Regions:
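An accessory alpha-helical subdomain
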Residues: 81, 85, 89-93
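C-terminal motif of bacterial Sec signal peptides marking the signal peptidase cleavage site
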Residues: 21-24
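Feature captures C-terminal
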Residues: 27-42, 91-93, 97-99, 105-111, ...
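Post-signal-peptide N-terminal segment of Sec-exported extracytoplasmic proteins
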Residues: 45-71
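Bacterial N-terminal signal peptides that target proteins for export
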Residues: 2-14
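Acidic/histidine-rich, surface-exposed loop or edge segments in extracytoplasmic proteins
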Residues: 66-83, 211-217
Length: 258
């Protein structure tokens, strides 16, 4: 099956026409007109590749291709990413939770990844280094956070407001308007009197994508060099060494009631 490339193929071009008026000795500008168009980023702009540029890159191309084409494992099924729950976001959230357990030296309660950070699908068949880079192109790194029960409840509400994200260890029921109806950790109701551990990425730990509750973590451990892409690649290699194919499915972790 052909790998699906979901990167944007369009570039927006906006032209601003300004008028200038003089006020005292200073020029003032006002926007008079805005025009926009979309330019397709395709072979039209590279119909005749620059021969000198190609010659410059050629000595490096074979080396890069050999690294990026290396097979790390095999996907048993195709896995996509979408809300409220998807196979690929489940898998990556599981990887984060497992990695957090390695940092803590004990099981972590929750894994969390933003669907928007997963940039491509994982299709059935061989998994190459290039595939993993296409899925996780950003330099996001592991952060292990400790949250109080009340803050974890708020985090679940943050996730509901987004229409769902990739979670591990959580079971959420939300509605189409983004309201949290029910939240459980490990099959149990959240206890506001205890603390919980969350394995996520630094981007979310900083409160981005609406995850404000994560900024109130009482403890925060972010191991240097523990990129999400590297953790995922390590996971694929471990599973392959154990003779297992990579597989994940929708399990009812985030259920949207209509």
């Amino acid at each position: 099956m052909e790998k699906k490339n979901t990167y944007s193929k369009w570039m927006a071009v906006v032209l601003l026409a300004c008028v200038c008026g003089l006020v005292s000795c200073r020029a003032e500008y006002e926007v008079a007109k805005v025009e926009g168009t979309r330019v397709a980023m395709d072979a039209t702009w590279d119909a005749e590749p620059d021969k000198d540029a190609l010659a410059l890159l050629e000595p490096y191309k074979a080396g890069v291709d050999s690294v990026m084409g290396e097979v790390k494992g095999v996907a048993a099924v195709s896995m996509d990413r979408f809300r409220p729950e998807s196979p690929l976001s489940n898998l990556i959230a599981d990887v984060l939770r497992q990695a957090a357990a390695g940092v803590l030296g004990r099981p972590a309660d929750v894994g969390l990844v933003n669907v928007g950070g997963i940039r491509n699908v994982l299709t059935e068949g061989n998994i190459t280094t290039q595939n993993i880079y296409e899925i996780l192109p950003f330099e996001n790194s592991l952060c292990v956070l400790t949250l109080g029960g009340a803050d974890l409840k708020e985090l679940c509400a943050n996730i509901a407001a987004r229409g769902g994200e990739g979670v591990s260890g959580l079971n959420l029921v939300i509605d189409a308007e983004g309201h949290l109806l029910e939240a459980k950790v490990g099959g149990q109701a959240i206890d506001e009197g205890r603390t919980y551990t969350v394995g996520t990425i630094d981007f979310l730990a900083e409160g981005n994508d609406g995850m404000a509750a994560l900024t109130r973590a009482s403890q925060r451990q972010c191991p240097e060099g523990a990129t999400l892409r590297g953790l995922f690649m390590d996971y694929v290699e471990r599973e392959t060494a154990a003779g297992r194919k990579i597989e994940a499915r929708i399990e009812g972790r985030v259920v949207m009631k209509k």
